[in-house]
């Protein structure tokens, strides 16, 4: 199979492969993810109570969310298609003393082998990096048990999002390497909600995650989904 058939963008994979060694550098290229992670992890745990539940993180990268979920008592599996990020994730889990099972596979391949196997599925800051996000969402829906919780987060597609997430984050504040994001791959909440409905998921909540460049902190803001946002859905 080609990477396109696997719903994988080889250029996106290569981008994160190059940066993998700095995944856990709190002041490096992934600092925004580290800053955002406590907010994401708390949001998920408050709504899904992850302790002792089987949780799958799709597009886990270097394992930032996986470790946070494992520390909260979840039984965590992380999947990704990048060799270098997965190696970094495995090594860091040994250093951290957390137990996470990391596997190189796509969501679609994994769903075919493990349908309805997880209580919670997370797919954060990943949908804007695949050729067909609707296909990934359908795979996530297949992986979660009936009544289980799914969380997606991504970036809205509008002029403000372009200004903040591309121009501001990559060129002005230099929080991210140039070229990290492709504006055309950003996803409007209405599009994500429709793809979730098509996959048999019921939207529970949508919330924005806003960044203050002065305090350098993120916070939840249910009234502002204009840039970063997270959606909580449940398998019907």
UniProtKB/Swiss-Prot annotation:
O-methyltransferase that catalyzes the 2 O-methylation steps in the ubiquinone biosynthetic pathway. S-adenosyl-L-methionine binds at residues 40, 59, 80, 124. This is Ubiquinone biosynthesis O-methyltransferase. The keyword S-adenosyl-L-methionine applies. Pathway: Cofactor biosynthesis; ubiquinone biosynthesis. It holds the Pfam family Methyltransf_23. It comes from the Bacteria. Belongs to the methyltransferase superfamily. UbiG/COQ3 family. It catalyses: a 3-demethylubiquinol + S-adenosyl-L-methionine = a ubiquinol + S-adenosyl-L-homocysteine + H(+); a 3-(all-trans-polyprenyl)benzene-1,2-diol + S-adenosyl-L-methionine = a 2-methoxy-6-(all-trans-polyprenyl)phenol + S-adenosyl-L-homocysteine + H(+). Its EC number is 2.1.1.222, 2.1.1.64. It comes from Saccharophagus degradans (strain 2-40 / ATCC 43961 / DSM 17024). GO terms for biological process: methylation.
